């Protein structure tokens, strides 16, 4: 059974040409390809929500995974869609993420360039993920008798290419999987975050979106609101006063 979202999306901006939407976790952008999943999800997608709630027909310019919350850009007409898609190809649409990962990186910032397989074949695709450490913590959470504590990092991530599960797969490949990732993560640490800290969900958020308005060339910058889960995460990583 696919869990449905516990909250609705939010329209953060719209005009005659485009929409910036905040997508909650556990919501598809559009109907999934899998027939069984499509029946279960029904009209619980961002595209259907825009039409059912606001009578808006819009086209997503990019995507977010089902489990990832954050900012999405939609075009409302064909000329706008074409211009925004050009910006995507020219890398003028910039997407920034927050992620909680297992462990501490040796360097405070870096770039991951490991090629990743295509979603539908074994073809290796060029991938670029930039990261920098925002904060590090060590918690009294043990996943085995060898280590009484566990280390975690809060990362700022810029996505330079947009492959399937790119951030999630890149972090897993460098041995720093994202917390709450059931497909590419560490089940022991996921369980501790859920049971001990009450953080149950993928700790990945599309937090900032930058692009140029396709008809005025004005730079547009948007920040995602803080959801209840991310409020817990922020509190966890805030420096404790002594």
Where do the language-model regions lie?
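Flexible, disordered linker segments and immediate boundary regions flanking tandem C2H2 zinc-finger modules
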Residues: 183, 241-242
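Pseudouridine synthase
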Residues: 43-46, 147-209, 230
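Residue-level detector of flexible, active-site-proximal loop/helix-junction positions
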Residues: 138, 185, 215
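RNA pseudouridine synthases
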Residues: 1-154, 174, 225-239
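Short acidic, glycine-rich loop/turn motifs
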Residues: 118-120, 161, 211-216
